[in-house]
Design a protein with these regions (language model features):
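N-terminal secretory targeting modules
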Residues: 1-131
């Protein structure tokens, strides 16, 4: 697996929505609903290391809410997975294919900004990121 940090993966991403580059945290944050990124890669697997910062629930201050992200398939229409990001820094499998190939996936934040912050720290693939 080849790992790409913030400075290495940025040239390969197409950002959409409100994103914020935080070099001190080493992450690209996409905190608003439907913001995120699109990336092309070769191989079978794409994993993302996500920094998730929980937020207190408005109705129950003892409850911490976490952001949900979704992965949209190559057709741009189908939501193929939904993940609740519950750890400060955690690896998530974004795409897993049976056969090696070239794939394009879009990752979006599904939850509201008030449900926590979400930052992309690193990407990892068994192939390579593509322009």
């Amino acid at each position: 697996m080849v790992q790409y940090n913030l400075n290495e993966f940025l040239p390969y991403l197409r950002r959409h929505g409100r994103t914020r580059l935080d070099k001190k945290a080493g992450a690209l944050f996409f905190n608003w609903s439907d913001s995120g990124f699109t990336v092309r890669f070769s191989g079978t697997t794409l994993r993302a290391k996500v920094n998730s910062i929980g937020a207190r629930d408005f109705m129950d201050p003892n409850k911490i809410e976490y952001a949900n992200i979704g992965v949209v398939a190559q057709d741009g229409q189908s939501l193929v997975s939904r993940v609740e990001c519950r750890a400060e820094e955690e690896w998530y499998t974004i795409w897993q294919a049976e056969q090696p190939g070239e794939y394009t996936v879009r990752v979006v934040k599904l939850s509201e900004n008030a449900r926590g912050k979400t930052g992309l720290v690193a990407l990892e693939t068994d192939g390579a990121l593509l322009e």
